[in-house]
From Swiss-Prot:
Modification comment: Proapolipoprotein C-II is synthesized as a sialic acid containing glycoprotein which is subsequently desialylated prior to its proteolytic processing.
GO molecular function: lipase inhibitor activity; lipid binding; lipoprotein lipase activator activity; phospholipase activator activity; phospholipase binding
Known function: Component of chylomicrons, very low-density lipoproteins (VLDL), low-density lipoproteins (LDL), and high-density lipoproteins (HDL) in plasma. Plays an important role in lipoprotein metabolism as an activator of lipoprotein lipase. Both proapolipoprotein C-II and apolipoprotein C-II can activate lipoprotein lipase.
The protein's name in its UniProt record: Apolipoprotein C-II
One CC-aspect GO term: chylomicron
Organism of origin: Canis lupus familiaris (Dog)
Record has Glycoprotein as a keyword: yes
Region span, Lipid binding: 66-74
Family affiliation: Belongs to the apolipoprotein C2 family.
Signal peptide from the UniProt entry: 1-22
Superkingdom field: Eukaryota
Region (Lipoprotein lipase cofactor): 78-101
Gene Ontology biological process terms in this record: cholesterol efflux; chylomicron remnant clearance; chylomicron remodeling; high-density lipoprotein particle clearance; lipid catabolic process; lipoprotein catabolic process; negative regulation of cholesterol transport; negative regulation of lipid metabolic process
Length: 101
């Protein structure tokens, strides 16, 4: 869980760093700026694709598929128990309110 947040933070900082770099370089001449902007854009897309694929691989390795099955099993068992005990509680409450008729 913590590695995902760290990875997201790293990606955000990387994007912000490229924005700052791009803003600094945009103050140069227009002729060199357009070529440099294109190069930076291609570089950014390349880094973004690499980071995205690395993040997907990390997520697939860190999150086991059996976790979904365990969560579903726990949820179904707990809802069955809660509904059973809620039914018992309702019956007891109704019998207390009605009294012995």
């Amino acid at each position: 869980m913590g590695t995902r947040y760290l990875l997201v933070l790293l990606l955000v900082l990387l994007v912000l760093g490229f924005e700052v770099q791009g803003a600094h370089e945009s103050q140069q001449d227009e002729t060199t700026s357009s070529a440099l902007l294109t190069q930076m854009q291609e570089s950014l897309y390349s880094y973004w694709g690499t980071a995205r694929s690395a993040a997907e691989d990390l997520y697939k390795k860190a999150y086991p598929t059996t976790m979904d099955e365990k969560i579903r099993d726990i949820y179904s068992k707990s809802t069955a128990a809660v509904s059973t005990y809620a039914g018992i509680f309702t019956d007891q409450l109704l019998s207390m309110l009605k009294g012995d008729s």
